[in-house]
Amino acid sequence: MSDFKKINPSAINESVFDLIGKDWALVTSGNSDKFNTMTISWGGAGIMWGKPVAFTFIRPQRYTFEFIENNDYYTMSFFDEKYRDALKLCGSKSGRDIDKVAETGLTPAFTEDGIPYFAEAKLVLVCKKMYAQFLNSESIVDNDLSLIHI
């Protein structure tokens, strides 16, 4: 992976609330022959079944969904603010219709195992898919975190 170094997930100092909710990210899946990416601003990170995990929600209608479904790995790439326009484009246009790499100028890169991410990212999470579930409105509990006591 270019100039990136592997770190323990617990060494990530940024707030997951800021990284995903405020800064946004690109979720990318596929291989060096064909991949797609889309902007995410929903998701989180934590511990599941004793392992560090990151998760996001992708509607089945999204082109990236096909890539996530057909591959065991995906990446979450986080960027500095100067890439906001690229993230806006990747969240509003479909890879079925445009070449997002050409339109944004972002540089695709690949892990040793061929998992796609973007070289301009400040942080990349390489994620192995361990669970997927279709959501329906009955399975969502709307408890916001507006009351936090410390």
Regions found by a protein language model. Give the residues of each.
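Active-site-proximal mixed secondary-structure blocks
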Residues: M1-I148
